[in-house]
């Protein structure tokens, strides 16, 4: 078992994201898992990502606040304890349209070597 203390998590940059901070909990440079990447992201009001698509599958779990996820022109407002699955190469945009910080857990498969 590996325990990762919040105080030991390291920040990372995610492409096409804005108004956010993210901490890598497991996988990639944080180690611990070779089969998935888990991060914790905080989106400020007005912060978000995309629209874009990437090969890895993703799951978002909303810890607190609310986040609007836009896929195929349809908007879904996710609140605390809601989650969603984003498929491989599925174009999505996420936006925090609230006045509070939105905190989410992101789990995804690591990119595979081509």
Feature annotation, model-predicted:
Residues 74-88:
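Short acidic-glycine-tyrosine-enriched beta hairpin
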Residues 40-43, 54-69:
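Short, conserved beta-strand element in jelly-roll/cupin
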Residues 15, 48-54, 95-97:
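Short histidine-centered beta-strand/loop micro-motifs
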Residues 48-50, 68, 84, 88-94:
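Histidine-centered metal-chelating micro-motifs
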Residues 24-27, 38-54:
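Conserved short histidine dyad/triad with adjacent acidic residue
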Residues 1-35, 114:
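A short, N-terminal "cap"/entry segment at the start of jelly-roll beta-barrel domains
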Residues 88-113:
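Ligand-binding loop in jelly-roll beta-barrel domains
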Residues 66-68, 75, 91, 101:
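Structural motif
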């Amino acid at each position: 078992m590996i325990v990762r203390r919040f105080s030991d998590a390291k920040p990372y940059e995610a492409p096409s994201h804005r108004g956010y901070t993210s901490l890598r909990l497991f996988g990639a440079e944080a180690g611990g898992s070779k089969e998935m990447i888990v991060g914790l992201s905080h989106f400020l009001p007005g912060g978000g990502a995309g629209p874009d698509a990437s090969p890895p599958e993703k799951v978002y779990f909303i810890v607190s606040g609310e986040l609007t996820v836009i896929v195929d022109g349809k908007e879904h407002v996710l609140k605390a304890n809601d989650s969603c699955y984003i498929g491989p190469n599925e174009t999505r945009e996420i936006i925090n349209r609230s006045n509070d910080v939105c905190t989410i857990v992101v789990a995804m498969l690591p990119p595979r070597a081509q």
